[in-house]
Amino acid sequence: MRPIILASASPRRQELLKNLGLEFEVQVSDVDENLEENISSGQLVEKLAERKAAAVALIRTQGLVIGADTIVVLGDKPLGKPTNREEAVQMLSNLQGKSHEVFTGLAVIDASTGQRVVTHQVTEVNFKTLTKDQIERYVDTGEPMDKAGGYAVQGLASIFIDSIRGCYFSVVGLPISKLADALRMFGVEIV
């Protein structure tokens, strides 16, 4: 069987692949995640996921390389990962009591042929109304700092989520159903 390579350092993505029983290696892609193009959120996460997977596929001679990228979008404003405490508090203050969308791009590239599948998933997340004190206590845990939108749906922030419409796993960072479809196109069956 061809090796599967995850082009991500995300412990959450690694855990999701482990839960599927997939044997995989991790090789982090060191790519510029800034795109200056005026494109839709779906196109943005697809391009970034593909860029990450392609960078690793250039190094590897064989295997299936998985790249992913997640952004949170409130209204028409994309929210990346907060860079400091104040930014995390501001993001969560803006998200609380509202609905937002989470876009996760997925790219699977066959390193030996260059054949690729690139797609994305959109999920709607509804946050409860939060107090300033709740937000600050959550930010003080440190959990928001490496997460798009400043929260971890699978962590402590789960108590802030009123509802999710779409793919929970996509909010965590990897649209599992779409990944299974992409791997199947390359002859890899999960079950």
Swiss-Prot record:
Residue(s) at site: Important for substrate specificity: R12, T70, Q154
GO CC terms: cytoplasm
Localization (cell): Cytoplasm
Superkingdom assignment: Bacteria
Keywords for the protein's UniProt record, in alphabetical order: Cytoplasm, Hydrolase, Nucleotide metabolism
Enzyme Commission number(s) from the entry: 3.6.1.9
Reported cofactor(s): a divalent metal cation
Reactions this protein catalyses: dTTP + H2O = dTMP + diphosphate + H(+); UTP + H2O = UMP + diphosphate + H(+)
GO molecular function, one term: UTP diphosphatase activity
GO biological process: nucleotide metabolic process
Membership in a protein family: Belongs to the Maf family. YhdE subfamily.
NCBIfam families given in the database record: maf
UniProt protein name: dTTP/UTP pyrophosphatase
